Swiss-Prot record:
Organism: Pyrococcus abyssi (strain GE5 / Orsay)
Positions with a binding annotation for S-adenosyl-L-methionine: 10, 87, 90, 115-116, 166, 209, 234
Protein name as catalogued: Diphthine synthase
Annotated InterPro entries: 4pyrrol_Mease, 4pyrrol_Methylase_sf, 4pyrrole_Mease_sub1, 4pyrrole_Mease_sub2, Dphthn_synthase
Subunit structure: Homodimer.
Length: 262
């Protein structure tokens, strides 16, 4: 009897690994959460049909506050699957859930799947040159987060690329676009005036990673902010110092201005 954290991958129900599918099918109970990420190419019904099980979707409150009451007691006497988009432990929330399972006396296993951290390699930027990542969050009343701006600054000082996740309000069906992310960054630039993110900043947008036809675009903010990248999910990348191969890839594959090749 155990709890299995199973990754569903990035885009549609076919992204789950064979191992993940096999284990999910043998589990007695299957739970899932979709508030930490969006799988744009599928829906709950299609995932249930593939697995052959009814899936109970948990809210953020269920996961963060009631996991010990809803999920862990079942895993004491049954095999239980907990499905998440992407790779299970990329979201720090899920690592904390595994700790809770251990304290509850429940054995747990992790079945990996495609993650945005590997998928960003399709941009041509070298994975080992990425620094700390950050999330651009929607401002709220009396709260305008700016920490992501500081992360970009720190990474640029070291010549490193910055992967920026874009906020998700799944319960409201609200998914931030790369355009919205750029606008928020420009607002922070107006506030801080440190020259970290301007109209002349080179950015890379990756939309619908994991699909057969993802959008990969690179260019200056002044141009990119007006582009239509299609439906979410999007991620935004601010490159650091570019290797010649990275620059050529961005030009030839992502449509960046040729002048970035130096």
């Amino acid at each position: 009897m155990a709890l299995y954290f199973i990754g569903l991958g990035l885009y549609d129900e076919k992204d789950i690994t064979l191992k993940g599918l096999e284990i999910a099918r043998k589990c007695d109970y299957v739970f899932a959460e979709f508030y930490t990420s969006l799988m744009a190419g599928t829906n709950l019904e299609r995932i249930e049909k593939l697995i052959g099980k009814e899936i109970r979707v948990l809210s953020r409150e269920d996961v963060e506050l009631n996991f010990e009451r809803i999920v862990l007691p079942l895993a004491k006497d049954h095999d239980v699957a907990f499905l998440t988009a992407g790779d299970p432990l990329v979201a720090t929330t899920h690592a904390e859930l595994r700790l809770r399972a251990k304290k509850f006396g429940v054995e747990s296993y992790v079945i990996h799947a495609p993650s945005i951290y590997s998928a960003i390699a399709i941009t041509g930027l070298h994975i080992y040159k990425f620094g700390k990542s950050a999330t651009i969050s929607y401002p709220e009343k009396n709260w305008f987060p700016t920490s992501y701006y500081d992360v970009i600054k720190e990474n640029l000082e070291r010549g490193l690329h910055t992967l920026l996740f874009l906020d998700i309000k799944a319960e409201k069906g609200k998914y931030m676009t790369a355009n919205e992310g750029m606008k928020l960054l420009l607002k922070v630039e107006d506030m801080k005036k440190e020259g970290v993110f301007t109209q002349e900043t080179l950015v890379v947008v990756l939309a619908r990673a994991g699909s057969l036809n993802p959008v990969i675009r690179a260019g200056y903010v002044r141009d990119m902010i007006r582009e239509d990248f299609g439906s979410p999910p999007h991620v935004l990348i601010v490159p650091g110092r570019l290797h010649i191969v990275e620059a050529e890839y961005l030009v030839e594959i992502a449509g960046a201005p040729r002048e970035i090749i130096r």
